[in-house]
Amino acid sequence: MNSIPISQMLFDIYNAVSELEDSTWNYHYPEYGDFYVYNDLDNILNIELTIDIDYDWECRYITFNMLNNQLDIDEDIPNDQLLDRLRWIYIQLCLK
């Protein structure tokens, strides 16, 4: 899985969520917190994550514009947690 580029994971997640009712996916996973993934009408993938920052669970946001491949990530999301969460979402939505 490490060889899949992040942009490809995001495209695949976007496509998987597009096929769901209301283009929305919610999940609570005790180890990883809460996930809320949805697509909007402007071809943007939105991901809300619960991240452990300084031993406190906080909500952080990721947006990916499908038209221009622009990725916006809240600054303080630790890279290891970000990649971990994206991989986990990818597995749940795209590899089942």
Q: For each of these PLM feature ranges, what is it?
A:
Residues I6-M9, I13-V17, L67-K96:
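Ampiphathic alpha-helical segments that act as solvent-exposed interaction surfaces
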Residues L20:
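Acidic-histidine catalytic/liganding microenvironments
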Residues S23-D84:
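Acidic, low-complexity, intrinsically disordered interaction modules
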